[in-house]
């Protein structure tokens, strides 16, 4: 067996009508003349929907080491519990997280993912809890998360049918360094001018309720009114958590935990985890992953790269952080 080592993953770029060019600032090689909305940093999906992932499988390729050119799924097969620890694959045997960067040049559609009750009654629907970490935001950029106080299911239905959904939604400023966790069932949309790092459960089930067709002269797409009304939660979403200096826990769900790490010209011991540790390097002027014991060769990293550290190595990994280094750590298990 090939000895385990941290896996640097190749991005999978997704064209979106609402996308832009800001992913280039994260080192993504964007094709000319095409708006790119998403960079799938970690994906292990045997299939996707046409609107979400293009209708094809999405499996991240490995960029470094002896497994270069193979997929993360291949590494799961080869290393088993050495990679996964106590973390369980999905029901289809895939990695239990989907990790992305999103560049919203325009507003994204207002949508909702299946509620626990809906998913329990529909075998083809899956929960999708997600967390947005705001990497950057233009002045005045906003997020649409949940509803204004007092909004009811009847109010939502009337707003969907009259094309006035934004009027009943809660709009909040997009603040760099803030993390917003959206339990499945939260009606939401990213606003224009926001660049986010997103960690989520690997579901592609989405019900759309508003698509900004008039605001952006977009072609009309199907709305999923009945499903959305059945799934929508009218509870107040969790308050955002803002990352301060050092290490800040910014999300803690039943599916994953997230920590924001800020360092400047320092060697940082990464936390031990019972499952694999995913690291998104959102800002750096130079960084590397090293082994305290010498168990793997040092790996140079650049801004925007995403790495999976096998569970067995999490207590041994050190981040050598250059100037102004920010990272998001996502753990499972």
Model-based region annotation:
Residues 1-151, 211-235, 258:
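Transition-metal
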Residues 99-100, 108, 130-133, 171-172, ...:
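His/acidic/aromatic-lined binding-pocket segments of jelly-roll/cupin-type domains
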Residues 102-107, 116, 126, 137-140, ...:
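Ligand-binding loop in jelly-roll beta-barrel domains
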Residues 144-167, 196-238, 323-333:
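Double-stranded beta-helix
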Residues 169-181, 190, 290-313:
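Short acidic-glycine-tyrosine-enriched beta hairpin
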């Amino acid at each position: 067996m090939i000895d385990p080592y941290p896996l640097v993953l190749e991005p999978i770029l997704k064209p979106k009508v609402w996308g832009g060019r800001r992913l280039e600032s994260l080192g993504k090689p964007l094709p000319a003349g095409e708006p790119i909305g998403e960079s799938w940093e970690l994906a292990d999906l045997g299939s996707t929907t046409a609107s979400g992932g293009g209708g094809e499988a999405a499996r991240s390729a490995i960029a470094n080491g002896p497994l270069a050119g193979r997929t993360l799924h291949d590494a799961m097969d080869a290393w088993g519990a050495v990679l996964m620890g106590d973390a369980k694959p999905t029901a289809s045997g895939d990695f239990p997280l989907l990790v992305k960067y999103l560049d919203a040049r325009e507003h994204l559609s207002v949508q909702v993912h299946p509620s626990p009750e809906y998913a329990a009654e529909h075998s083809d629907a899956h929960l999708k809890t997600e967390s947005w970490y705001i990497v950057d935001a233009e002045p005045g950029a906003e997020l649409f998360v949940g509803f204004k106080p007092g909004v009811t299911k009847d109010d939502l239905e009337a707003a969907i049918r009259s094309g006035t959904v934004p009027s009943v939604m809660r709009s909040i400023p997009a603040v760099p360094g803030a993390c917003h966790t959206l339990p499945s069932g939260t009606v939401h949309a990213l606003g224009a001018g926001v660049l986010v790092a997103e960690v989520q459960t690997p579901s592609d089930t989405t019900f759309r309720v508003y698509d900004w067709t008039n605001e952006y002269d977009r072609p009309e797409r199907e709305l999923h009114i009945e499903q959305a009304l059945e799934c929508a939660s009218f509870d107040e979403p969790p308050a955002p958590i803002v990352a301060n200096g050092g290490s800040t826990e910014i999300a803690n769900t039943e599916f994953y935990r997230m920590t924001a790490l800020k360092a400047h010209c320092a060697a940082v011991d990464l936390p031990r985890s019972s499952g694999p540790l995913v690291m998104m390097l959102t800002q750096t002027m130079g960084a590397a992953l090293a082994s305290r014991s010498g168990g793997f060769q040092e790996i140079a990293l650049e801004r925007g790269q995403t790495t999976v550290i096998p569970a067995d190595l999490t207590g041994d990994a050190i981040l050598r952080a250059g100037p102004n280094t920010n990272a998001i750590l996502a753990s499972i298990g």
